[in-house]
């Protein structure tokens, strides 16, 4: 170091040496006492000496903590937010009415996926179709009685026993379209062989013209008389006769006795008539009165005859057909002798029901001469409520085995007000989703509505409790929790089964009651009719006597059966209450088991599995995929900020929130150390300079304009210098001297986490640990203005997700509006600029700067 001294004289003053030093020397001389080194390169550098090793360790620690941020936590939080928002969307979607589902009550299955356009479905074990043994489908043109936009159970169920109404008795196997072609039957007189030939102009054989009809579905070809079929629009399509005619139900007819079918099921066609059994040995007289059998409603030119070998004989013929595949059904020919037949409208063709003890033949007969008829067995016998293929002589009725059909109303228009709610499988009974449409419940329902509501509530509580508390379950208790959950669900399912059984019994009771009422109504109508008529025609064998016709009109229900039903309902009520009690106990045990918190990722995983189970109940919906795509997009765009904030909140003392608090504590105490060092420096100056510290600071601050802590002291009154002079020595203790010699030691101790000598430091560490480690406290506390949402449960997550979505959508809308406004402004500016340039160009053209027009000069 080079030092040059100039000794000069100041008039009246003291000779002062003037030295020239380097910047480094000036900085080193003041390092011991000044808290900051005031050079132009680093005015704000702290006086405390930080070791490079500590800085490296801090950097390494921060890099390690950054690497410790596991991806599973982010995935769990993302799935949790997605599941919460998706659950809200699904909750809203499941409550919407589905217009394409029409029905009253679907027990045992849904109407979804049914191949029929039906409003009511019945199954073989469902007593709603009681007392039928065989179920038939039919259509109806009769409108259901509506009262205030509501249909009662019996009217909607459409089982008015013995009620006469217009309908089309439709059988799914036979009353359908057939592809038919006209054929001729040719036979030689010497043999019983008949050939089937395809011709255009047909001729009669056995008194009828013939059709060869094909049923493609069953690979069956039927040879039938043309009188049995009805052509549709002059095409090759034919349907059996009677498919679109008026029918009514009656009590007794021969088919009841022979087939053993329940008496309130059959329907036949008008007008009423009676038939007499075999009279003379060789012939049977057919008339429209007689005491033996009450048949009910048949078409004109139809009669009933008891089968006898003297009345009708089978004519055995061999039908030869060239080529055919599958089954070829040929008719059975009879020759019959009937006497005293009066044909309506003098028609030659009549219909005759020929019955025996073990079989029935429905004959179509043509009168060839006086009492002789050529008859053929009809392929489509119009008997009962459906069109059945009647048995052949070699196909006798032994065990009364019939085709089974499902009963349904295939008419959407008359029950279009009924709708089913598409549920996720939780609700036991689907109900109407609209006001003023629903089942009318009365007191006789035995509290079924309350029981159903209890089952629904128990199921909803079980599922919601399972999904909510699974987030607070320890890993080692998951299996136990699932067992309790399964027990709750099993109890709920058992309760649903019991309710289903109650509903079956209830429907049977209501339908039987309705049947009894209708029997009484019809009996009253018949008695009123007989009071007007007296006796039927001239026979006087069937007259009104005022006594009930017991066997014809059926039997009323006995009280013992009704009492048995009531007792069963009471037993089921007790079983349901027991089942609900067990479900409640299992649910309480599940709540007791869920007593400790678990990871958020496990909650997200379990909740996502529940959502995945709910999604199939929605069906194929494009709205579902659009909503899920938008949710995923919004969450992906907003997840970084959410995850960053949640990371600071929930990661504990080692999280960024803890580090932030530590840094705040460090800077705060560093500030205190700097202030204390400055005060000690002032004490030293006061002791050395004798009160000239103020002048010294003024000179220093005039040369160095730094904004440190000393400015605060400069603004204070100058009296503090004297107080420091007087009491400065009391501040300088052994500990103070040690801290002056090593100003960074206390700070390093705080950094190392000792904090034993500072009570404030210890309390702060405790506060950090309590805020970082306790999950329950994060619901009511906040760190840096961020609410700890993840531990507040599913409802808060759902609300937060919806708020985020609404905010994002509003943000996108506002940004889009800003873009539109910016584009409009640019367009307007462009238009104005074009107009300005055009006007400027026109103005320049009209007013050029230099005139090229020379004016004429006159001399």
UniProtKB/Swiss-Prot annotation:
Origin superkingdom: Viruses
UniProt-annotated stretches for the region Immunosuppression: 498-513
All ranges on the Extracellular side of the membrane: 7-614
Coiled coil region boundaries: 576-624, 663-699
GO BP annotations, alphabetical order: symbiont entry into host cell; virion attachment to host cell
Keyword Glycoprotein: yes
Glycosylated sites: 40, 112, 141, 148, 186, 214, 233, 244, 340, 368, 399, 406, 411, 422, 483, 490, 550, 557
Site label Cleavage, positions: 444-445, 684-685
GO CC, any one term: viral envelope
Keyword terms, alphabetized: Cleavage on pair of basic residues, Coiled coil, Disulfide bond, Glycoprotein, Host cell membrane, Host membrane, Host-virus interaction, Membrane, Transmembrane, Transmembrane helix, Viral attachment to host cell, Viral envelope protein, Virion, Virus entry into host cell
Post-translational modification: Specific enzymatic cleavages in vivo yield mature proteins. Envelope glycoproteins are synthesized as an inactive precursor that is N-glycosylated and processed likely by host cell furin or by a furin-like protease in the Golgi to yield the mature SU and TM proteins. The cleavage site between SU and TM requires the minimal sequence [KR]-X-[KR]-R.
Propeptide, residue positions: 1-6
One Pfam family in the UniProt entry: EIAV_GP90
Transmembrane portions of the chain: 615-635
InterPro entries: GP41-like (IPR000328), Gp90_EIAV (IPR001361)
GO molecular function: structural molecule activity
Keyword Cell inner membrane: no
Fusion peptide, as annotated region: 446-466
All ranges on the Cytoplasmic side of the membrane: 636-859
Assembly information from the UniProt record: The mature envelope protein (Env) consists of a trimer of SU-TM heterodimers attached by noncovalent interactions or by a labile interchain disulfide bond.
Job of this protein: The surface protein (SU) attaches the virus to the host cell by binding to its receptor. This interaction triggers the refolding of the transmembrane protein (TM) and is thought to activate its fusogenic potential by unmasking its fusion peptide. Fusion occurs at the host cell plasma membrane.
Official protein name in the record: Envelope glycoprotein
Organism: Equine infectious anemia virus (isolate P3.2-1) (EIAV)
């Amino acid at each position: 170091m080079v030092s040059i001294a100039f000794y000069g004289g100041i008039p009246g003053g003291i000779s002062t040496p003037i030295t020239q030093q380097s910047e480094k020397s000036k900085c080193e001389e003041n390092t011991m006492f000044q808290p900051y080194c005031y050079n132009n390169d680093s005015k704000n550098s702290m006086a405390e000496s930080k070791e490079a090793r500590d800085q490296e360790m801090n950097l390494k620690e921060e890099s390690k903590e950054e690497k410790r941020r596991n991806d599973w936590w982010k995935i769990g939080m993302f799935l949790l937010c997605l599941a919460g928002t998706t659950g809200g969307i699904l909750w809203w979607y499941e409550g919407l009415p589905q217009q394409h589902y029409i029905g009253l009550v679907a027990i045992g299955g849904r109407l979804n996926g049914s191949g029929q356009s039906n409003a009511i479905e019945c199954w073989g074990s469902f007593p709603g179709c009681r007392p039928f043994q065989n179920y038939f489908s039919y259509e109806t043109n009769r409108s259901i009685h509506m009262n205030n936009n509501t249909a009662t159970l019996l009217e909607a169920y459409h089982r008015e026993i013995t009620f006469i109404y217009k309908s089309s008795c439709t059988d799914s196997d036979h009353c359908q379209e057939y592809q038919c072609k006209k054929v001729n039957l040719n036979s030689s007189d010497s043999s019983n062989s008949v050939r089937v030939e395809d011709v255009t102009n047909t001729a009669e054989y056995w008194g009828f013209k013939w059709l060869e009809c094909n049923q493609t579905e069953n690979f069956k070809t039927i040879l039938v008389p043309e009188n049995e079929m009805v052509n549709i629009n002059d095409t090759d399509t034919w349907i059996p006769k009677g498919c679109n005619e008026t029918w009514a139900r009656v009590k007794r007819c021969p088919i009841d006795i022979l087939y053993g079918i329940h008496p309130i099921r059959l329907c036949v066609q008008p007008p009423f008539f009676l038939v007499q059994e075999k009279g003379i040995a060789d012939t049977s007289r057919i008339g429209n009165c007689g005491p033996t059998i009450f048949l009910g409603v048949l078409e004109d030119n139809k009669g009933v005859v008891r089968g006898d070998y003297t009345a009708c004989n089978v004519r055995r013929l061999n039908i030869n057909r060239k080529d055919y595949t599958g089954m070829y059904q040929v008719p059975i020919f009879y020759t019959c002798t009937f006497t005293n037949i009066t044909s309506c409208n003098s028609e030659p063709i009549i219909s005759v029901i020929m019955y025996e003890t073990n079989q029935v033949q429905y004959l179509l007969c043509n009168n060839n001469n006086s009492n002789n008829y050529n008859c053929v067995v009809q392929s489509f016998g119009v008997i009962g409520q459906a069109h059945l293929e009647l048995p052949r002589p070699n196909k006798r009725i032994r065990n009364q085995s019939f085709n089974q059909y499902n009963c349904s109303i295939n008419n959407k228009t008359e029950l279009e007000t009924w709708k089913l709610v598409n549920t996720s499988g939780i609700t036991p009974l689907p109900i109407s989703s609209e006001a003023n449409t629903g089942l009318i419940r009365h007191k006789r329902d035995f509290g079924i509505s309350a029981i159903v509501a209890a089952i629904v509530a128990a199921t909803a509580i079980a599922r919601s409790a399972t999904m909510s508390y699974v987030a607070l379950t320890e890993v080692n208790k998951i299996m136990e929790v699932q067992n309790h959950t399964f027990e709750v669900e099993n109890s709920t399912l058992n309760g649903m089964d019991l309710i289903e059984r109650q509903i079956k019994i209830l429907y049977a009771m209501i339908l039987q009651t309705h049947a009894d009422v209708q029997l009484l109504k019809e009996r009253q109508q018949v008695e009123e009719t007989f009071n007007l008529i007296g006796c039927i025609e001239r026979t006087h064998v069937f007259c009104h006597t005022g006594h009930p016709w017991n066997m014809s009109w059926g039997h009323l229900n006995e009280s013992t059966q009704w009492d048995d039903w009531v007792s069963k309902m009471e037993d089921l009520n007790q079983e349901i209450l027991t089942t609900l009690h067990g479900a409640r106990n299992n649910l309480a045990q599940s709540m007791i088991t869920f007593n400790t918190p678990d990871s958020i990722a496990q909650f997200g995983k379990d909740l996502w599995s529940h959502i995945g189970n709910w999604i199939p109940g929605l069906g194929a919906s494009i709205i579902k995929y659009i909503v899920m795509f938008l949710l995923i997009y919004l969450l992906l765009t907003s997840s970084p900020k959410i995850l960053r904030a949640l990371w600071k909140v929930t990661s504990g003392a080692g999280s960024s929130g803890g580090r932030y608090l530590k840094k705040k504590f460090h800077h705060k105490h560093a500030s205190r150390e700097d202030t204390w060092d400055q005060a000690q420096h002032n004490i030293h100056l006061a002791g050395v300079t004798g009160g000239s510290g103020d002048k010294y600071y003024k000179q220093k601050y005039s040369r160095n304009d730094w904004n440190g802590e000393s400015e605060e002291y400069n603004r204070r009154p100058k009296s503090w210098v004297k107080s420091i002079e007087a009491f400065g020595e009391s501040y300088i203790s052994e500990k103070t001297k040690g801290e002056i010699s090593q100003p960074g030691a206390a700070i390093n101790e705080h950094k190392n986490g000792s904090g034993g000598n500072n009570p404030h430091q210890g309390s702060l560490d405790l506060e950090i640990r309590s805020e970082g480690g306790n999950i329950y406290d994060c619901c009511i506390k906040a760190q840096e203005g961020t609410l700890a949402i993840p531990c507040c449960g599913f409802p808060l997550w759902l609300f937060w997700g919806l708020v985020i979505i609404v905010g994002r959508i509003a943000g996108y809308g506002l940004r889009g509006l800003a873009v539109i406004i910016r584009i409009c402004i640019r367009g307007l500016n462009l238009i104005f600029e074009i107009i300005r340039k055009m006007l400027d160009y026109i103005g320049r053209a009209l007013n050029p700067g230099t005139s090229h027009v020379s004016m004429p000069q006159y001399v």
